């Protein structure tokens, strides 16, 4: 049983589709059961919960063998940060300038999702889990360099790094994928059958590497494929790698060879 967290998002939807194509049993953790049902019908088990609320997690992780975590929020303050109450013009100025005020008034910041939420999920995961796969971001180790210093203005790379550290330090088998700027989609208005017909618009090859040296775009379709394929190959276990699209794309992507080329 594979638990997909963030399953109704741009990458997560494709992850679910690719898992189902492979015949895997899929469970999803979602805050919005209605949206999940529209996307996946009855093809997956749906558990309502929230990684920001640890007490909602134990039932969802019970008897799962793998967790694929594709959660996230916007890098910059937006409605997706779930401010309560909704800020007026003056308050928006305070949000942009005062980090303490920002965290106090928003429920869905990068810190609350990618750092605290992921840490909650890791702490609740079964101790005999076969793999924890996490979608992070390029630039984690270059947050003081442009353009990543701009991307990290409100702490998204800091939060992703804390999420990575929680996973690495947990003792669980893991794979951490750091994609470039996400393209192709998100396909949030299509049903599952339409979603599975989506193809990478750029037709570029998949390039993976270590050490946070890569930059560029990454197809959501290829990122989702990397998440799914990684759980089937031991060479990807314990690996943290970047993924971007560059060069001429071959007829098929040989994921096993890509994973085997990663330094251990």
Question: Positions of the model-derived regions?
Answer:
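N-terminal Rossmann NAD(P)H-binding glycine-rich loop of SDR-like oxidoreductase domains
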Residues: 1-24
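A conserved pocket-lining segment of Rossmann-fold NAD(P)-dependent short-chain dehydrogenase/reductase
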Residues: 198-218
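Alpha-helical substrate-binding/gating segment
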Residues: 219-264
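Hydrophobic residues within alpha-helices
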Residues: 11-15, 121, 163, 227
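NAD(P)H-binding glycine-rich loop region in Rossmannoid oxidoreductase-like domains
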Residues: 8, 28-127
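Substrate-positioning beta->alpha
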Residues: 117, 159, 212-229
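Conserved beta-loop-beta element that borders a ligand/cofactor-binding pocket
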Residues: 131, 136-141, 146, 150-153, ...
